[in-house]
């Protein structure tokens, strides 16, 4: 059996729509094995997803088909599922990356992360979640001719934590995409380009006092925020309680606050605020995962 662990991810990072992503230290773990009996065998997977349309199986089959690898049956087990589903934290990317890595391992082939990225983008459609899930850390990504993904890892200074403010409801990527405008004003493009460049420099040199301005966005957040109850109140309170910045994680509905890693009051203050307002959201204090997806050995 092959065990694979994949981190959560937060994409967009304010102005970096479909281009910036970061890996975070909550994980899903998966186990894969070949079976002598023909068929698909699932464990830890909801019944409605126990079929050939399962995204994990689709990723595995993509690799097997590419290399003409023949198999009778396959076992897919979710050992641990700590990444919340449809919350803007890369749960689907985790499944895709795990399936691809698991497939290479089952074939006994070397894990080529560049190839895994290309295959993952063919499935996902964009690289900003799958790329940090594969490589870890903070990455800047683009698509060349809508086919080939290019990426560069961004060095960052320590000193910050990421606080995921996770609503108790799901928001599908399809619904979140549907509210976006078909065209964006030129001035809004300039607004985001400048802040995306500033954001990368803030992470690189540790000038986190500029993050509040550097994570602002005019391309997607104001449209998607209308789908999220309590968005404005939670966003404003996070800044009031001392966060460097707050932004929508991925397509939402999770909001991500960045705080000083020495700040011991933010989570306490926010927890009390949520309780007082009866806002039933989860709060997770996270750090950057620097390693990305990996095969677990000897566990």
Tell where the protein language model's regions lie, with residue ranges.
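Solvent-exposed alpha-helices and their adjacent loops that cap or buttress functional pockets
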Residues: 10-12, 21-24, 68-70, 88, ...
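Short beta-strand-to-loop capping motifs
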Residues: 34, 143, 167, 257-261
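Short, conserved charged micro-motifs
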Residues: 38-41, 173, 262-269
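Alpha/beta catalytic cores of group-transfer enzymes, especially the acyltransferase/condensing modules
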Residues: 113-158, 246, 252
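Active-site rim beta-loop-alpha module in soluble metabolic enzymes
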Residues: 166-226
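Glycine-rich, charge-dense phosphate/pyrophosphate-binding loop(s)
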Residues: 203-299
């Amino acid at each position: 059996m092959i065990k694979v662990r994949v981190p959560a991810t937060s994409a967009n990072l304010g102005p970096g729509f479909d281009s910036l992503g970061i890996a975070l230290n909550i994980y899903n773990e998966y186990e894969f094995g070949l079976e002598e009996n023909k068929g698909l065998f699932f464990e830890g997977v909801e019944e409605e997803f126990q079929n050939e349309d399962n995204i994990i199986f689709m990723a595995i089959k993509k690799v097997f088909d590419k290399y003409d690898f023949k198999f009778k049956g396959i076992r897919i087990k979710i050992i641990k599922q700590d990444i919340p589903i449809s919350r803007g934290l890369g749960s689907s990317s985790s499944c895709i990356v795990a399936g691809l890595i698991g497939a290479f391992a089952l074939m006994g082939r070397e894990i080529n992360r560049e190839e895994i990225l290309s295959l993952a983008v063919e499935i996902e459609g964009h690289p900003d979640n799958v790329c940090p899930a594969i490589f870890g850390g903070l990455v800047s990504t683009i698509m060349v001719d809508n086919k080939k993904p290019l990426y560069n890892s961004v060095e960052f200074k320590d000193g910050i934590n990421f606080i995921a403010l996770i609503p108790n409801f799901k928001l599908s990527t399809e619904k979140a995409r549907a509210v976006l405008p078909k065209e964006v004003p030129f001035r809004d493009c300039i607004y985001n380009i400048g802040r995306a460049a500033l954001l990368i420099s803030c992470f690189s040199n540790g000038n986190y006092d500029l993050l509040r301005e550097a994570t602002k966005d005019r391309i997607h957040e104001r449209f998607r925020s209308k789908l999220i109850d309590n968005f404005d109140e939670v966003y404003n309170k996070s800044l009031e309680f001392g966060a460097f910045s707050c932004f929508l994680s991925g397509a939402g509905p999770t909001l991500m606050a960045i705080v000083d890693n020495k700040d011991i009051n933010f989570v306490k203050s926010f927890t009390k605020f949520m309780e007082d307002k009866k806002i039933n959201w989860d709060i997770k204090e996270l750090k950057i995962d620097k390693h990305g997806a990996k095969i677990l050995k000897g566990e």
